[in-house]
Swiss-Prot record:
Highest classification ranks of the organism: Bacteria, Bacillati, Bacillota, Clostridia, Eubacteriales
Record text on subunit structure and interactions: Forms a stable energy-coupling factor (ECF) transporter complex composed of 2 membrane-embedded substrate-binding proteins (S component), 2 ATP-binding proteins (A component) and 2 transmembrane proteins (T component).
Keywords, ordered alphabetically: ATP-binding, Cell membrane, Membrane, Nucleotide-binding, Translocase, Transport
Family of the protein in this entry: Belongs to the ABC transporter superfamily. Energy-coupling factor EcfA family.
Protein name: Energy-coupling factor transporter ATP-binding protein EcfA
Domain ABC transporter: 2-237
Cell compartments where the protein resides: Cell membrane
Chain residues that bind ATP: G36, R37, N38, G39, S40, G41, K42, S43
Topology with respect to the bilayer: Peripheral membrane protein
GO-annotated cellular components: ATP-binding cassette (ABC) transporter complex
The gene coding this protein: ecfA
EC code(s) of this entry: 7.-.-.-
Single GO term (MF): ATPase-coupled transmembrane transporter activity
Amino acid sequence: MISIRDLTYFYPEEDLPALKNISLDIRENEFLVILGRNGSGKSTLARLLNGLLLPSQGKVEVDGWNTADANQIQLIRQRVGLLFSNPDNQLISNQVEEDVAFGPENLGLNTAEIRRRVNDSLRLVSMESYKNSAPAFLSGGQKQKIAIAGVMAMKPRYLVLDEALSMIDPRGKREIMESIRSLHKTEGVVVIMITHDLEEAREADRVVVLEEGEVKTISTPEELFPSRASLLALGLAPLEISHIIAEINRQGILLSTDILDIDKLVEEICHFV
């Protein structure tokens, strides 16, 4: 579990905190989404989860290890994998398998274990056939898959995705979400997805909304997403399916506003045919 207690963070020479009095437990086997408009503190929180930043006040503990403990920081960063929006910033080699092997090599693992981890990680993201390719010639979605594989080769318990799909086309987003679902369900990886896009958050177990550096609400997609007024007040764009339901309801066919899935929407409409 990642335990956050009374967390406040100030950037150097800033008078106002980027995060203020955050307390949150990220549970085992959880798919957690952190939402918020730009400047709400989401990316700052991501960097605090694995010790890239250290709290100004309060504490962050990863499986009982305090991120402020210099003796534990390497173990914490192995446990908490962090993925950013631009994969080019995390790809460093001229060959896919070399890039994925970089992390395990730095752990001092033997050659056989490194090979096993590289193969397993590429298989998890369905990129085995690209192991000898140059990352520069891959699509944005494929590059992000390789970045995920590189993180997963470190065998993290937690995967933090900081706007990791924001620069990817719709097809690439679907492919990466499939990989993330697989990691969560089959590998037991705790997923912490930081985004402003509700479409990426529909499968979350819980949703945390940040506003001006504070936790505004903790809810579930089923509770929060149908409320267009609440979402707009939080600076979040409602799901496209919510717009469709609202338009249909204006035509006199009264559909449930709780529907979040297009297949369920079609099924509901068929009841009126």
